[in-house]
Design a protein with these regions (language model features):
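Class I SAM-dependent methyltransferase Rossmann-like catalytic core
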Residues: 6-44
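Conserved SAM/SAH-binding beta-strand->alpha-helix loop
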Residues: 79
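A short acidic, Gly/Pro-enriched loop at the edge of an enzyme's catalytic core
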Residues: 106-117
Length: 232
């Protein structure tokens, strides 16, 4: 299965960027080389896998190429236009339309912990409180040894040292590519002590409550829970 981006995907992505540049934060979908970097450490036994901000599904296809069953994927996407296409393109995956900042509060992911999280979210365009809510919530849904993979267009880890330390996490750069628009680096975020579950939950919940973000989750057949500010 190829991870190359079709012309139709590019057009949809570009239109979404034009309509909401802060939410999409890139003029084109991620490239094939970046998709390989983002998923290079993922193995079939790591499932189930959570993907945040999958957009047109570039990283999703790379996960399938790595041998992850489609049924083991949960795709969290805020944009309705992307969520609709993802449901049609990956019918066996669980597609949830929601703000990723609500991961630790929505109660949708308590049935089985994830082995890893792949994030295509534009963290550089988000507030520190929102980043902490997303990352903290993601680690609440993960197995103790799970890792959070994030790419960035910046020169350093997009999650600040203060946020990492408050959640008991560490960031490690695992690669980069100039063959992407724009060039990007990839970081693995993991627990400082894999045997301990992050204890930062109450802190990041309070931070997000102060920003007035409400819960929002729409899955095929599920009702709205209130619309938040834009994220993925």
């Amino acid at each position: 299965m190829t991870t190359k981006t079709s012309c139709g995907d590019f057009v949809q992505f570009f239109r979404s960027w034009v309509s909401d540049p802060l939410r999409v934060a890139a003029v084109a979908p991620s490239g094939e080389r970046l998709a390989r970097l983002m998923t290079q450490e993922i193995e079939p036994l790591d499932g189930p896998i959570l993907e945040l901000g999958p957009g047109t599904g570039v990283f999703t296809r790379a996960l399938l190429t790595r041998g992850i069953p489609e049924s083991a994927l949960t795709l969290v996407e805020f944009g309705e236009e992307f969520a609709v296409r993802l449901r049609g393109r990956f019918p066996e995956a669980r597609v949830v339309q929601m703000d990723a900042a609500q991961l630790g509060q929505c109660g949708l992911f308590e049935d089985a912990p994830f082995g890893a999280v792949i994030s295509g979210l534009p963290l550089l365009s988000m507030s520190p409180a929102k980043i902490e809510a997303i990352v903290g919530g993601a680690f609440e849904t993960m197995k103790p040894g799970g890792a959070f993979y994030q790419f960035t267009y910046g020169p350093r880890c997009p999650i600040s040292r203060s946020i990492l330390e408050s959640l008991g996490l560490k960031g490690t750069r695992i690669g980069g590519t100039v063959r992407n628009i724009p060039p990007a680096g990839v970081y693995r975020i993991s627990r400082q002590n894999p045997l301990e579950i992050s204890t930062g939950g109450s802190k990041y919940r309070r931070a997000e409550d102060n920003t007035g973000i409400g819960a929002y989750a729409t899955e095929a057949g599920k009702a709205d829970m209130g619309r938040p500010e834009a994220s993925a």
